[in-house]
Amino acid sequence: MILLISDLHLEEERPDITRAFLDLLHHRARGAQALYILGDFFEAWIGDDGMTPFQRSICAALRELSDSGTPIFIMHGNRDFLIGKAFCKAAGATLLKDPSVVQLHGEPVLLMHGDSLCTRDVGYMKLRRILRNPIVLFILRHLPLRTRHKLARKLRSESRAQTRMKANDIVDVTPEEVPRVMQQFGVRTLVHGHTHRPAIHKLQIGDQAAKRIVLGDWDKQGWALQVDEQGFQLAAFDFVNPQLALPGA
């Protein structure tokens, strides 16, 4: 059994989400073949050298799971793209490139955070290209921590304001981009997060059936995708009783 999650937006101000995530680590993930975290794991990440005590506690919890034998893979999101090798090494996790094709129970599956699929959001795509430029990343990582904190707060504030003003179809994936990317990587299954619109979409690519699975964000409830011999099963769970509502739970 393999678990995939995304968009937890972990922060100290949401202990309910943190408790639910730790419950996931201590129960379902403990016996999993792998745990994939597909971006926006943290609400903000200003660099591995700027870890708070809260973030260090999450790192330690991941390390405990990794040491128990469950491989952990972390992908950058638009909120935590400064997560680096130091954090992953401390957490016992592997940093996964976006996009990546992985084998899940014998099937090649394309994993993405999902923001790069939202090509109609021209302003965001332009900002994304700037922030992901290697030179810009180098500069960001070497700015004083205080400056990075201010910049992160400014970017989050502007992002929320702009998202509220944009039409729903603008901030969702571009329909034509999905089959193009899937054909490019030669897969029939795509899993991503980012849009906060959990669903399993059936597609037709050429003469082949395909599917796009959108992971949910953790806010009023949590979401996880379980992949096993039975296939792909997307399910939500309640924070009040954070045992996953997944088959076999």
Curated annotation (Swiss-Prot):
GO terms, molecular function: manganese ion binding; UDP-2,3-diacylglucosamine hydrolase activity
GO terms of biological process kind: lipid A biosynthetic process
Subcellular location: Cell inner membrane
Cofactors that this protein relies on: Mn(2+)
Protein residues bound to Mn(2+) 1: 7, 9, 40, 196
Gene name per UniProt: lpxH
Cofactor annotation comment: Binds 2 Mn(2+) ions per subunit in a binuclear metal center.
Assigned protein family: Belongs to the LpxH family.
Keyword annotations from UniProtKB, A to Z: Cell inner membrane, Cell membrane, Hydrolase, Lipid A biosynthesis, Lipid biosynthesis, Lipid metabolism, Manganese, Membrane, Metal-binding
Name this polypeptide is given: UDP-2,3-diacylglucosamine hydrolase
